[in-house]
């Protein structure tokens, strides 16, 4: 089967479980690219028309359920003699596995799971579907705490060859209602009894009735009263003890009548564990056994013994058609051992009792269970067309038939039966389903199933039907793609008045956890330094060269970044930021001046020129003398230097002073009288 594609859509990947009637495969929907579970009827049943009919009929009915606590049936079909049902794929453990791992659960957890299971049953019951096999093996719990009930209404069949092997008959016997065990008419209340057993096992870690065979267990369901769970686990409140005992009443009349009732009481206990719960089963808690019929049962082990070591699904996923675990012996509790020890019976009585039990087991197993599974005796459907639905249901249920009520808009009075399917006077077996089409009155509209539709499609559909969109909530979902409907209120197929509002919950997809990272500030760092620092922080870098550096020290340094500091991201998300860094430093070109202009300037003028042009001029010796030449008569940059040569400045002659003393005469020379001189004329030659 692996690799086979069913319906040109579902590719079988691996077998994840096997039950008495079917295999379950993990598959991939090639159209929507998601995992699904595909249940395939075993080959030995493919030629049994009744089993195949029920297999498909029940699956089609479940497909119309819309509840977050129901494993959705997505498709049903036949290909190459392969009958299959496609369901949502749920990653999780069965409640049975959880109880095996942890033992008794905290009562708060049991209440929470119980409410969700009851809501799933309520949804099914409103659509006329009885589960008939409520047990921990058919309750899946995901890691996120989502509770999903599976195997709704999947018809189970048991023939005489199966009855012959009583040790492999229906591992579900631990959760049977008394009416199931007797093979009599069952209704919605049978599911509530089984839910009571599940609650019992959650808070105690054991099943209330156990035995060495399914028949023995079935007899205990009929005859014996369970030990109150509080006698086993003192930590549970009296209110929850009373609720469980009421749910497990032998007579359906004394039980909870609807799933809504049990949900209400569970909610009360959740808010106030000390609340008083009305229980019709409040009898002397020391009275563990109540005889319902004169049947002698040997080896009356205590009701509450350890659960069978292998009391679980063959599938471990979605289905429990049969268990092969009923061979283990019960472990008696100490009080009952004491009772048995004090009661000595003769071998003859034990032999007689054993024979009676074998006879009872064969009778119950072959007639009762077979009757339950195969539908019972023939009855004729009466004509209830035109009657009020309450009267019609009473008549049909009185004949042992199950009633599925469907509302249809009509000009007839609301609540009047319009049609019956199968037709009036048809012969069917007790336990068969009869569909009543009931007038919803004028203006009544059947709410469509919006599962897996997007919000736009929902709006268009509602508008075309004359309905309005109510509240739109969003929730994370591991199984429903983002943007599609998870649940709706009112539920699919409910009849409402025109203009009514329909509330939907839309999937936000899988919840993605976030984390916070710190992005370091790398301003002023070189590009390589910045890359290293950010890489150590788990941040990628996109370096971008920016403006030119204004100094040699700025060249190649980071001057800005796109993100820094604390940043919240999706867990595992890759973060890359941009950093901007300075380019190379370009030395600016300085202005140049013609130093040749200095020639001919006076020293003062040359100094002024030098100051103005920021050039160092050396060699100026006088403010009045003129520059004769320049060391560089070409272009000189600001900040540069030149030297100049100044012209010689002519000094004016000094006049001779009159009456200057004569120089002494040489010896032996006669002094000559000195002649007065004429003063020289001053001026330029």
UniProtKB/Swiss-Prot annotation:
* Sample GO molecular function, one term: protein serine kinase activity
Q: Which organism is it from?
A: Clostridium perfringens (strain 13 / Type A)
SMART domains, sorted: PASTA, S_TKc
Q: What is the lineage of its organism?
A: Bacteria, Bacillati, Bacillota, Clostridia, Eubacteriales
Give its E.C. classification number: 2.7.11.1
Q: Which residues form the active site?
A: 143 (proton acceptor)
Q: Which residues form a coiled coil?
A: none
Its EC top class is: transferase
Q: Where is the composition biased (Acidic residues)?
A: 306-329
Q: What is this protein called?
A: Probable serine/threonine-protein kinase CPE1738
Question: Which keywords, in A-to-Z order, does the entry hold?
Answer: ATP-binding, Kinase, Nucleotide-binding, Repeat, Serine/threonine-protein kinase, Transferase
Identify the InterPro entries for this entry: Kinase-like_dom_sf (IPR011009), PASTA_dom (IPR005543), Prot_kinase_dom (IPR000719), Protein_kinase_ATP_BS (IPR017441), Ser/Thr_kinase_AS (IPR008271)
Bias kind Low complexity: ranges: 627-645, 654-685
> Which residues does ATP bind?
16-24, 39
Task: Quote the catalytic activity from the record.
Answer: L-seryl-[protein] + ATP = O-phospho-L-seryl-[protein] + ADP + H(+); L-threonyl-[protein] + ATP = O-phospho-L-threonyl-[protein] + ADP + H(+)
Domain Protein kinase as annotated: residue spans: 10-275
Bilayer-spanning residue ranges: none
